[in-house]
């Protein structure tokens, strides 16, 4: 359709007098009809123009539903309706350039490369989703909080920080956002009870501080095909006196690590190892311990999702405030279980892991088992699952099925029933109080978009970090 500006319309109806005289004779247009034509055009043209824009937006929505969001718990009609809501809610922020940041995981790569583009096309908001290291995300949040300057409009931050966010008073609780400045841009189909991990992002005041975006567990990983080989099972029983299988405690894990690294040594012409880990001096070495390694050994009190009063970090907590880490101050960070956990970490890394593991960090080590020379790993993040099922890699069968399996984490000698065992991590949307309201609302729309039911199942299949119960 040809769009005619108001200036062009004026020129078309107010011609030089000589032209008017020549035109009025053959057409005999009365003055009243001329006025009617002008008024009619002033109403019809904007309507037709708006219809054109609406049709264009509908086409964009349909394109994404048909080409990308092909797996969803919603029907196609429900998906279109939800995306139409996003397009309408975003109108006040159309044209804004919004910046959000997260750590680099397969799930967030999909968000950054695909979902940000979809959101931008559907809403008219230019969304930049940056990827960086988790330690850098923490530094950025800390800088915005302490320096009182806005760096980003939204963050995806580990739920481990719930205590810091609650105590700082600098984070805008999601509960307050959806009942306050963000009420008009909160998806009526958000369905909070459907989310996994809300307990992790809820403060002592029972307010939700962060909206879960993805979650993954830390579990035991092993080569099921090797564990089932008759020759290896026979040799293991001859050496250790019991069947080769999934270990339930650290002693059995150490036996299996020794078996593959020291006694088997080589399989199918390749050097193999009974253990994998990482040890480079890096921020990620911190969460190698904070992600419940100490409590797996038994350095915490009974309680879920955290031990109380001593949590899985070995820190004594009272009213959501840390009051002591050392034994002398009521903590467990230097207690027998923690010392044992540190000793096993160093010993196994040196004796049973590939030599290069000592110089690796979290990101570098995560995908190493996919190379096919690792028998087991006691501390493995399911966030790397997507890297472990790619066709053609050594740990995947020709039919696409995995040669590996996951199982619950083995427990250390100090562990008692009722203690936390293993680890679950939630990466969640976090918004600062000192951010601009309009920019924050636009970022809040994007946060809801990437966890919406229209999108979430496809995102789960891409990154394998499910966040909605309905998707599972």
Identify the role of each PLM range.
Residues 132-140, 248-252, 356-371:
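Short helix-initiation/N-cap motifs at beta->coil->alpha
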